[in-house]
Amino acid sequence: MAEVESFQLDHTKVLAPYVRLIGSETGPKGDVITNFDVRFVQPNANAIGMAALHTIEHSMASLIRDRIDGMIDFSPFGCQTGFHMIMWGEHSSEEIAKVIKSSLEELASDEFGWDNVPGVAEKECGNYRNHSLFGAKEWSKKILSEGISTDPYERKVI
């Protein structure tokens, strides 16, 4: 069976919230993609509720693209502690952490409302009833209050 990098990570040693570069890959035509572990909560200590996580996912899909070109995907971990962020090109953890921080700041703001969350209607979402803007905002505030580190093992908050 193939080894999966994220299952090799010692989840007992990391200090969330953080952004970690998992790795870069070069395709057959020379295109580079980078994969990041965007960890919002401490593994095995907490988990973001599904409705809040779902709304964070939808909101960040747009907010991140407003701030940086080349995002391929921002997908939640099944453990509900964070997201995989896949980008075209080479990017640093610091660059991505700044984008994540800025995006969460907008999501947490009083000005950000349901009109700003994309894809929450029945024809746009496969589980449109399972969203919580209140939860997404509360988690965003908590993550921001703890600070986003550029290192998973040592707190280097941006």
UniProtKB/Swiss-Prot annotation:
Pfam families: LuxS (PF02664)
Domain of life: Bacteria
GO MF term set: iron ion binding; S-ribosylhomocysteine lyase activity
Cofactor: how and how many bound: Binds 1 Fe cation per subunit.
SUPFAM superfamilies named among the record's database cross-references: LuxS/MPP-like metallohydrolase (SSF63411)
Catalyzed chemical reaction(s): S-(5-deoxy-D-ribos-5-yl)-L-homocysteine = (S)-4,5-dihydroxypentane-2,3-dione + L-homocysteine
Disulfide cysteine pairs (residue numbers): none
Class in the EC hierarchy, top level: lyase
EC number(s) on file: 4.4.1.21
Membrane-spanning parts: none
Cofactor: Fe cation
Binding site for Fe cation: H54, H58, C125
GO BP term, pick one: quorum sensing
Swiss-Prot/TrEMBL keywords: Autoinducer synthesis, Iron, Lyase, Metal-binding, Quorum sensing
Similarity comment: Belongs to the LuxS family.
Role according to the record: Involved in the synthesis of autoinducer 2 (AI-2) which is secreted by bacteria and is used to communicate both the cell density and the metabolic potential of the environment. The regulation of gene expression in response to changes in cell density is called quorum sensing. Catalyzes the transformation of S-ribosylhomocysteine (RHC) to homocysteine (HC) and 4,5-dihydroxy-2,3-pentadione (DPD).
Record's subunit section: Homodimer.
Protein name: S-ribosylhomocysteine lyase
Species for this entry: Lactococcus lactis subsp. lactis (strain IL1403) (Streptococcus lactis)
